[in-house]
Amino acid sequence: MLFGSISHWKRQLAEGAATPAELVERLAAAMEKENPALNAYLSWNTEAALQQAAQADLTKPLGGIPIAVKDNICIAGSPTRCASRMLENFVSPYDATAIARLRAAGAIPFGRTNMDEFAMGSAGENSAFGPTRNPADTERVPGGSSSGSAAAVAGGIAIAALGSDTGGSIRQPASHCGIVGMKPTYGRVSRYGLVAFASSLDQIGPLTQNVEDAALVLNAICGHDAKDSTSSTQPAEDFTAQLGHDIKGARIGLPKEYLSLGNDAAVAAAVDRAVKTLTGLGAEVEEISLPHAEAVVASYYIIACAEASSNLSRFDGVRYGHRTGIPGGLDELYSRTRAEGFGDEVKRRVILGTYVLSSGFYDAYYARAQRVRALVARDFADAFGKVDFILGPTVPTPAPKLFDADLTPLQTYLADIYTIPANLAGLPGISVPCMQEGCLPTGVQLLAPHFKETALLSVAHALEQALR
């Protein structure tokens, strides 16, 4: 049971049916009751949220609305642990720009959501503080790495949440949990205050109960930021402006490669249902090709792990974070601190990243992966010369069982095969629920050219409304 959308609570607050403090208290009570079964939240501070609620300005776009926040986005005075022992006792001294903008819009950051450690994972199983569970079936994964954000929204213990998306970490758990998840164009949302995994791929975005709420959150957090050198100077927009518009004549491409990679029958049925629905709304759906689709996973993991190897080198026991208590020299300090502080998946990716950047292997792996990335971007440029949007599965299968012993690491990595391309090319993408009643949640993904979020949200909203 969902807690109620942003739009719903804005009306309730405006009409005096509830106060911001009452909303925080009701949400906190739901969190206390439901979180033990889901492990969606790592912590929350009800007292601090109530203090903010007492000063809420209901005339602001998100006035009095609590928003959950992934544990890798800095909130001043709040633990920012990245679900890792390495940062278990770290308290952020400042707000991320996205948080500052939420506050400026009147929202109340409330609750730190669980995640795969340092955003490395596709299942929500890699947290140092225990796995997150899927509200649809607590024996299954919620997806990752924004596992807690997705589970909190789907489980009725968050109105909306922020996550981060490096290779699908917003859209993939949104699909598995049956909610909306959106990755904006790279640079749309400032990365200042987001703990880096792979800097050329990371992007903050919303996980929400519906498309309208995603647009409302984007309105608050988007815009240029001088503190982020990769921040776009593209003017901010009203992302709700085209919601409810007719999409007749919209040209939508369906990549043939996305239909030939062994999708689960439920996923194939969801895509077919979306195609029929969009066609019924007057959109024109045609087959297209993305020739390098099968190379994206290898390219992504080489690039992302290389960047992670560099970004995570700062966690060495000297400046901040975990520091080993075992005496020894400087080399021992580094190695023991990192061995104790990082989990297995993080170690695996740091080792891989160091390897592909090392002498003799840079050209063989990293440089080739970057060339594939350029080819993927060119594939999309060619496709968007023919169509306005691209439709496909968000993930190849519904949510697997937690700690499924039959799944190999490679199969786990392949779960992101449809979401990774948007990160490599820097495109906006959104996952919209499209499941049959009685079945596990699954979603379909819509992609658009750079900075076409407003049009993308319009099509996603039309699809969402028609599917209801």
Label each PLM-derived region with a short phrase.
Residues 49, 70, 102, 130, ...:
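Conserved hydrophobic/aromatic pocket- or pore-lining residues that grip, position, or stack substrates
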Residues 47-54, 106-107, 116:
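Long amphipathic alpha-helix in the N-terminal Rossmann-like dinucleotide-binding domain
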Residues 62-204, 257, 305-306, 392-410:
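Short glycine/serine-rich loop/turn segments
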Residues 1-45, 280-282, 355, 468:
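An N-terminal boundary/leader segment
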Residues 23-27, 299-300, 346-354:
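Short alpha-helical scaffolding segments that buttress acidic/His motifs in well-ordered protein cores
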Residues 14, 33, 155-160, 166-261, ...:
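Structural helix-boundary/capping segments
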